[in-house]
Amino acid sequence: DCGYNDPDDLFLIGESGGFLLNIQPGDKFVNTHLFTEAADFYRKNKQYTFYKVDSIPHRQFRKREEYRRRHGFTAPCLLRNGVVQDVRITGGMYNYLNYTMIEQLDTTTAKATLKASTGKKKYDFPKFIDAQFWTWHVMEFAVNNGFHLIIDKTRRGGFSYIMASDTANELNLNSRKVAIHVAADKKYLTATGGLTDFTINNLRFYETKTPFVRGLLTTNA
């Protein structure tokens, strides 16, 4: 209503003129497996589709998934006032949930005592987290309205995975795209577990495991 690009009506303007998240009391996300059907299929079958490469159904699948990675995906996953409603995740979040592998705790191995907690790690697709739903929408809102964005984040909260996924998604979807990563020390970018390292891993995943092969990945200087 105030001239901002907010198609999902997720933002309010506060008394100070700043933006607030339009979170309604009692809202709850449900049926979130509908957001991750591509990831679930890959986890089960070790591939995203059974269609023959470059067949018409394969091309249609690729175009559909590229559209979702760019524009987002809507599904009946929001419970509000006792009624399940459609809600959209952003294209970046759709890509993150379905085409990004991250290191995470294998909950089947978790053990806790009064003194310590232990568990093994595994690589898998991210789980849907409601806080990240808002993170991705804030990022999209900033881009769509020409704003700069500073995120005050916690350490070890998965933001490097999120930003690397976003970078890789933009580079894979768009030709002649440039992404710049900056850090106080380059080891936070290029060393194993750094932002750029994660991004390269994501680009390699596109090239080797998905229908989105572009043949452009090289790490040669």
Show the residue positions of the predicted features:
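Phosphate/NTP-binding elements of NTP-utilizing enzymes
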Residues: D1-A221
